[in-house]
Amino acid sequence: MIVNLITTVYNFLWGDLFTIPLPGGSSLGISLLILLLIPTGIYFTIRTRFLPIRLFPDMIRALSEKKNEKSSLSSFQTLIVSTATRVGMGNLVGVVAAVSAGGAGAVFWMWVTAIIGSSTAFIEATLAQLHKEEDPLYGGYRGGPAYYIHDLVEDHLKKKKRYVLPAVLFAIAGLICWCGISQVISNSVASSFKNAFSIPPLYTSIMLVILSAIIVLRKNATVKVLDFIVPVMAVCYFFITLFIIAVNLRQIPSVFARIFEEAFGLRQMAAGGFGAVLMNGVKRGLFSNEAGSGSAPCAAAAAECDRPTKAGLVQALGVFVDTIVICSCTAMIMLLAPKDLIDGLSGMDLLQTAMQYHLGKFGVIFIALTLFLFSFSTFLGILFYARSNVAYLFGDKWCFQTAYKVLALVMLFIGGIAAYTFVWDLGDVGIGLMTIFNIIALYPLAGEALSELKSYEESKKS
């Protein structure tokens, strides 16, 4: 029954809301999430006057923002936390899923989602800074969509309330999403460790749960661990990919030609596959870079900044790093492998086969260990996100914080032996519901973030 419910909600969010006829008798299905994300990204890109391109140097400079309070986080640390979840499983498993289902053209639509999504990420992160509050449990600050949605409804009603329904629904959707992601984490790691080391999924799941519990059940260990893991894993993965690209340099032009040809190709339209290309690219782009979903603002709110705009710029940069850089690395690893070698494969089997082609047995081991680190950091990152949502729903009580962590650890264990499609659908349902509630709030609140952006740019001139 639960599986049927999840499938029904998944189809409502990601299934075809309506179709657009295409040449050759085929059609393009447009889902509710596509209808929300693409126009929203374009709208905010125009309203911010193409911020991702125009203010890219400012994004880099914002990383140097210093903090004054010991218990708070710097802009760079909040980027590390959000990058832990962005540069995580979505960059490996997500890209594999997108290319498996939608072909090479899905990579292009992931890029598009990232470019226009950077502006959305800026708006939501800036709003999180504007509506943050002090965190009496962990120290520093907390916030996110549940908090700015709450303030929006309170302003509309012109009265103080303990809870408002849209904020409650967002917080619940977030907790569902992160439980779903917890399952995907162990599912993917267990699969890769079985292929690389012949370790049964049960043992891998137990190991992952124990290591995670050691970190997450301690008060403020999460950020300290992520500060070390995230830069190391991202740099190692990037340079291994550069090596593979250098070895296969002559094939690069044909790979890019394939990406663009399949993104717009008449062959895909005629076969009715263009919708799958677009849908899988955008869906996996969202799952990877989180722009518009409301996840990253939970980290952005924790930053100590002299201007809220700087937190927004940092999170916009995070979207770029995640999708344009790291996701492209995974795509190149797959697309530089012979097509007949990986045809019929999916998930981690596909990626490990591609890595084995490039680097031999070392490639299989490397991708298994990389996935483990990416997934481990993702789990730590999503539990950081969950703090503010648990606090919004249940108040400043440690028992509820601990209870959700234990629930997530249980889901982490279950995911190692669960069906692949089911766990992806649960994560997609959660992130889809979050996106709906978040985007509905962004439009009436965007003026606050745009006003901050205008003030920031005027201060640069003076």
Tell me the role of every PLM-derived stretch.
Residues 1-89, 99-106, 117, 413, ...:
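N-terminal alpha-helical transmembrane segments of multi-pass membrane transport
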Residues 50-75, 97, 103-104, 119-160, ...:
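Flexible loop linkers connecting adjacent transmembrane helices
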Residues 47-52, 91-95, 177-190, 212-225, ...:
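Transmembrane helix-loop junctions in multi-pass membrane proteins
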Residues 69-101, 127-130, 137-153, 169-172, ...:
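Alpha-helical membrane segments and immediately flanking helix-loop junctions
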Residues 116-124, 204-219, 230-250, 283-286, ...:
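Selective recognition of specific alpha-helical transmembrane segments in multi-pass small-molecule
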Residues 40-45, 113-141, 150-187, 191-215, ...:
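Helix-loop-helix module between adjacent transmembrane segments
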Residues 36, 44-60, 166, 187-193, ...:
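Membrane-interface loop-to-helix entry segments
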